[in-house]
Amino acid sequence: MSSKEQNTPNEQASDEIETEQAKNQGADTAAEAADQRDERIAQLEAQLAESQGGVRDAQLRAQAEIENIRRRAELDVEKAHKFALEKFSNELLPVIDSLERALEVADKSNPELAAMIEGIDLTMKSLLGAVRKFGVEVVGDTNVPFNPEVHQAMSMMESEEVEPNHVMMVMQRGYTLNGRLLRPAMVAVAKSKG
């Protein structure tokens, strides 16, 4: 045997140790790589879950916004239908006022005017009936509590017959359209004597 072929037992042990160490280093490197891979997988899964949560949240917000837009559109259409007659109704109020004034100043004692007065009265009643069909209501009762939302106080008068802060006299009737004020009633409000 040549000297190269002969390995001393120390050399053989040293070779085995190096081989063992190389195997251990390879195993350690493989374990580290596996750990890094597992960490990266965990990070990516966390990012995926977070982005999916964000997508779900965005989807829910979008659905809620669509529902809100739909509801607002329905309300707008409902209001448009309900109050479409507001301008037209406001234009009719002076006509009703004129008919009322004509009845107030008409000479009811003159028999020659009786037919005309009756015609004006029927015309006014017919016009009021027509506007009521479309939601126009009269505000003009007396002996009711003064309500600043539908009454405009023109004066205050002392009275023993009418309770204080109640409508004593209506100077001009007011009107509402489906609960919305078209014109306040101009009234005199009672106050206690004192």
From Swiss-Prot:
Spans of biased composition, class Polar residues? Answer: 1-12
Region (Disordered) location: 1-39
A cellular component term (GO) from this record? cytosol
Sorted keywords for this record are:
Chaperone, Cytoplasm, Stress response
In terms of superkingdom, the source organism counts as Bacteria
Q: Name one GO biological process term.
A: protein folding
Transmembrane domains' residue ranges: none
Q: Name one Pfam family in it.
A: GrpE
* Gene3D superfamilies per UniProt: 3.90.20.20, Head domain of nucleotide exchange factor GrpE
Q: Which NCBIfam families does this entry report, sorted A to Z?
A: PRK14139.1, PRK14140.1, PRK14150.1
Similarity field: Belongs to the GrpE family.
Described function: Participates actively in the response to hyperosmotic and heat shock by preventing the aggregation of stress-denatured proteins, in association with DnaK and GrpE. It is the nucleotide exchange factor for DnaK and may function as a thermosensor. Unfolded proteins bind initially to DnaJ; upon interaction with the DnaJ-bound protein, DnaK hydrolyzes its bound ATP, resulting in the formation of a stable complex. GrpE releases ADP from DnaK; ATP binding to DnaK triggers the release of the substrate protein, thus completing the reaction cycle.
Listed under subunit, the entry gives: Homodimer.
Tell me the protein's name: Protein GrpE
Please give the organism: Erwinia tasmaniensis (strain DSM 17950 / CFBP 7177 / CIP 109463 / NCPPB 4357 / Et1/99)
Task: Name the lineage.
Answer: Bacteria, Pseudomonadati, Pseudomonadota, Gammaproteobacteria, Enterobacterales
The gene from which this protein is expressed is: grpE
